[in-house]
Amino acid sequence: MYFDKSKLQKMSDEITLTLNERIDKMELVVKAQSILIGQDERGNSYQSNILRLINDMARGLLNQCQSTMHSHRVQRNYRSTESIAWTIEEFDNYIESFNTTTKLFRDTLERFWPTRNFEPMATEAKISTVRVRFEYLRDELIKTSQAG
């Protein structure tokens, strides 16, 4: 469905804010995981190395999200909501993988150090996808276009 450029731009701006929020939270998770890894008293143990690999995967997914975000900002004039949806779909796939990586990090920590309590940001954070926000904005855009 095609809409007025200014309305699509407003929607794009809202999505940009949402993407930034998700990226900020992902950065906090990656940093919290790095801090936990640094707290291993034995230093460069194989457990820490495994956790570093998992943290590197999370960092890579964060970088992919930042790249998608950059593409979204560069794509200034969307022609349709479908083109915004493609960006959202790509971003959400990375978020879902990031959440899986966070769960793997938590499971690995619990296996290596079952009696310790860990920073919830590093082990329990679940980043919500952007799809719901996009669908809400799209539905509002359709309503206002039909009413006006």
Q: What is the meaning of each model-derived region?
A:
Residues 1-34:
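Leu/Val/Ala/Ile-rich N-terminal alpha-helices, chiefly Sec-type signal peptides and the beginnings
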Residues 24-148:
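Long, low-complexity or tandemly repetitive, helically biased scaffold regions used
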